[in-house]
C-alpha cells in the first residue's frame, strides 16, 4: 500500500484504473488487475464502472492544467519582480493609479473565442480568476481571465443560456445558470462544475438569475411574468412574486439581501421588500422609460455621496440610508435612468444610439458603465450629473449584450496595520474604520456580444 494515499484514496485509484482499462477495451488487463486486488465482480459492478471510468482522465487533465498555470504564474512573478527591480518613482505613480477612478480602455487585454453563437451573459468568480459565459449555443464556458484561457465547457441546457451568476452559499461558492429551456441549473466548481441541482417551475424562458447575499437563496426572473425565490440547498421554490404585466427581463438583489429590484417589458421597474420571504411586499414602481427595460442595477453605497445631493439629501445622512437608496435602469429607448428610493428619476443619461443592454456601477461609486447594441461601452460620471466621460466606440464588432465588473476582494484587517514605512497603505484599498475588512477593487471588466467574443479589459 502506498504511504502517500489513504486506504480510501488507494481504493478509488484502483477502481479508476480498472474502469479506464475496461472502457478502452483492455478487458484482460482489467480482469487481471481486479484479480490481483481481490475485487469481485459483485463489488465492481456496472454502476461502479460508470462512476469511475472517466475519473482517471479528469484527474490527469486537471494536473496538466494546474502545472501549466503554475508555470505561467511563475513566469508572471518573474516579470513582476524584474519590473519592481527596475521601478522608478514615475513608473510607480502610473501603476498605482487609484482603482476608484480606473476605467476600461481599448484594446481589450484578451478577446476570447470559443462560443458558436451570441454570448448573452457573464459572471466572475468572487475569489478566483474564473469567469463564466453563457450563450445561444446552449453552453456555458469557464475561462481564466488572468491567463486568457478556456478551462472547461458545461453542457446541460437544451436551449439558449440567458444568465449566469456565482454566489456564496452554505455549500460554498456555486454557479447558477438559467435558460430558454425553462430551467435553472446549479453547478459546483469544487466538483469539476458538476450539475448538482436543476430547478423547475417557471412556465417560460428564465431570463435572469441571481444569488441573494447572505440568505442561501436564489432569485429568478422569467418571461412568464413572475419572479421566483428558491432555496439553494433543497432546490424548492419558496415564493413566487407576481406584479409585472409582461416579461421580467432582469432582477437584482440588494447588497443586504432584503430587497429585489426588477424590470421588464411592461416598461416599469419595481422594488420588492423580501425581508419576510413568506410575505414579500411591493414597495415601489418606477415609471418613465418609453420602451422595454432590458437591465437594472442597485447602486453600491460608495455611490451615495455622488447621488445624495441630487436627491436633496445631506451627506450627514449617508450612514442612515437604505441598501436600495439609489437604482438604475437601461432601456430599449436608448437611455439609462437613475432613480431614488421615492421613485423619482434623478437623471436620464442620453448618448447611446441603440438599445441599452447592460449596466454596472463602478465599485468605487463614481461611475456607471453601460453596454449597447450600438457596439459601444460608455462610462458616465455620477459626480458630473451623469456626463459621459469615456466611450469605447468599438468594444465589439456587433451588439454588446452583457457587461460585468469583477467583484471586489474582501481582506481581513489586522489591528493597526501599517506599511513598511510606518504609514497606512491606502493605495488600492477602500478601508473602513474599527478594523473592519478591507475591500480591494479589482480593475477588471468583461463584456460579451453577438460577435461571439468575450472581451477582458484589465489594468
UniProtKB/Swiss-Prot annotation:
**Which InterPro entries does the annotation name?**
Dynein_regulator_LIS1, G-protein_beta_WD-40_rep, LIS1_N, LisH, PAC1-like_LisH-like_dom, WD40/YVTN_repeat-like_dom_sf, WD40_repeat_CS, WD40_repeat_dom_sf
Give yes or no: UniProt keyword Phosphoprotein.
no
Q: Which residues form a coiled coil?
A: 61-88
Q: Name one GO molecular function term.
A: dynein complex binding
Keyword annotations for this protein, in alphabetical order, are:
Cell cycle, Cell division, Coiled coil, Cytoplasm, Cytoskeleton, Microtubule, Mitosis, Repeat, Transport, WD repeat
Q: Name one Pfam family in it.
A: LisH_PAC1
Q: Which GO terms of the cellular component aspect does the record hold?
A: cytoplasm; microtubule; microtubule associated complex; spindle pole; transferase complex
Write out the annotated subcellular location. Answer: Cytoplasm, Cytoskeleton; Cytoplasm, Cytoskeleton, Spindle pole
Instruction: State the superkingdom.
Output: Eukaryota
Name any Gene Ontology BP term. establishment of mitotic spindle orientation
Q: Where are the WD repeats?
A: 114-155, 157-197, 201-240, 243-282, 288-349, 351-390, 395-440, 442-459
Domain comment as written in the entry: Dimerization mediated by the LisH domain may be required to activate dynein.
Which PANTHER family does the record match to this protein? WD REPEAT DOMAIN 5B, WD40 REPEAT PROTEIN
Q: What function is annotated for this protein?
A: Positively regulates the activity of the minus-end directed microtubule motor protein dynein. May enhance dynein-mediated microtubule sliding by targeting dynein to the microtubule plus end. Required for nuclear migration during vegetative growth as well as development. Required for retrograde early endosome (EE) transport from the hyphal tip. Required for localization of dynein to the mitotic spindle poles. Recruits additional proteins to the dynein complex at SPBs.
Family, as annotated? Belongs to the WD repeat LIS1/nudF family.
Question: Assembly state and interactors?
Answer: Self-associates. Interacts with nudE and dynein.
Q: Which protein is depicted?
A: Nuclear distribution protein nudF 1
Protein's organism: Talaromyces marneffei (strain ATCC 18224 / CBS 334.59 / QM 7333) (Penicillium marneffei)
Which gene underlies this protein?
A: nudF-1
